[in-house]
């Protein structure tokens, strides 16, 4: 059986987005190239870490002067994308492990997302993408530095668009309030 690898070597769009109300959101990555849209599901923390690591990698490459192309300090105005996810959102798989890389020759950032298999879910691990004993679907997206900066900006915006924090205990507030431990269980 051939395991699909969803590749977007020069995407028109690569974004993080959500479906659902705050507190019940499902997080997605979505890549689009030449009319083909690939969506994968992942955890909020994975979106947050991916955006942070992209920025860190670009900052490191920029500081070392290890790029053949200019790396912007922040997102470029012409690349800002606040549009929603392309609908319908049909996830190809749930993301377990992710990896980032920098292609020094081409000056491009490479993102790879590997499927969380049933065996991984049962063992409580995210699996090893190099383990050939398990067939894993994957998503591979190649981004310019500008596209990566925009992804990181939007990822931060999406992650922080959820529920606000309780001013007393810093736990997320549900629309109906919550039982605040610092206020001895009094609903806030």
Where are these regions (language model features)?
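Mixed-charge, glycine-accented linear interaction segment located at domain edges/termini
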Residues: 117-177
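Short, structured motif recognition centered on aromatic/hydrophobic residues
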Residues: 25-30, 50, 54, 109-113, ...
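Non-transmembrane "mature" sequence context
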Residues: 86-87, 168-170, 182
